[in-house]
């Protein structure tokens, strides 16, 4: 199921959402250590947001976040709410959940940086956007523990994001059609954040 969803089969999302609910209702979501796996939790939050199940997503975070590993719980909850508020176009609230956020691992740091960048784009905070781009780029290059595929995705995201910012500020004459072609060439997976920006 995860493989098919990650390949971008949009029609499969409803089926995946139903499966997730079945797993929750049957109480078979915990791993062998009796905790809610971080990656699984993130998948549940994202499918809820993608399908615009806002109430369901908020209830899910409140009910199940206490079963996340203690060392990443706070960061994961903040990111989850930040993503949810971003999807609701409540950008200031989304940023509030990232205030003082450090990110104890590369997944959390990357998520928070992408959320900040997308929020800065939506709220026309271009100075903050350029600063965050530079900070994120340095983080990627200076952390060898980040898998190569994740580094490539993050750098490609920054490439597309910079093109979007340059268009919005009038720095670049590139249009959205050219950006979409660039996304195909570098095989950038469609994400909630990038698609949200392209729709404007």
Each predicted region: which residue ranges?
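C-terminal non-catalytic interaction modules
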Residues: 130-200
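Helix-turn-helix repeat elements of alpha-solenoid scaffolds
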Residues: 8-22, 48-60, 86-95
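Residue-level signature for tetratricopeptide repeat
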Residues: 2-7, 43-50, 80-85, 119, ...
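C-terminal structural cap/anchor segments
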Residues: 77, 81-150
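Solenoid-like repeat scaffolds
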Residues: 21-35, 62-72, 99-108, 135-146, ...
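Residues that mark the junctions of alpha-helical repeat units in TPR/alpha-solenoid scaffolds
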Residues: 12, 16, 30-37, 74, ...
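Generic helix N-cap/helix-start motif at coil->alpha-helix transitions
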Residues: 1-2, 32-42, 70-79, 107-113
């Amino acid at each position: 199921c995860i493989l098919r969803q990650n390949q971008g089969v949009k029609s499969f999302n409803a089926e995946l959402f139903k499966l997730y609910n079945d797993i929750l209702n049957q109480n078979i979501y915990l791993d062998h250590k009796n905790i809610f796996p971080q990656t699984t939790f993130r998948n549940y939050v994202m499918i809820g947001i993608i399908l615009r199940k806002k109430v369901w997503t908020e209830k899910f975070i409140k009910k199940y976040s206490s079963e996340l590993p203690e060392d990443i719980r706070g960061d994961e909850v903040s990111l989850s709410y930040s993503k949810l508020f971003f999807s609701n176009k409540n950008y200031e609230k989304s940023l509030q959940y990232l205030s003082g956020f450090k990110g104890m691992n590369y997944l959390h740091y990357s998520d928070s940086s992408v959320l900040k960048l997308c929020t800065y784009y939506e709220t026309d905070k271009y100075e903050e956007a350029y600063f965050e781009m530079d900070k994120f780029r340095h983080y990627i290059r200076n952390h060898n523990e980040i898998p190569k595929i994740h580094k490539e995705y993050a750098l490609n995201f920054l490439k597309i994001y910079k093109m979007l910012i340059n268009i919005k500020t009038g720095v670049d004459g590139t249009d959205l059609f050219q950006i979409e072609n660039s996304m195909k060439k570098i095989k950038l997976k469609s994400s909630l954040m990038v698609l949200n920006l392209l729709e404007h």
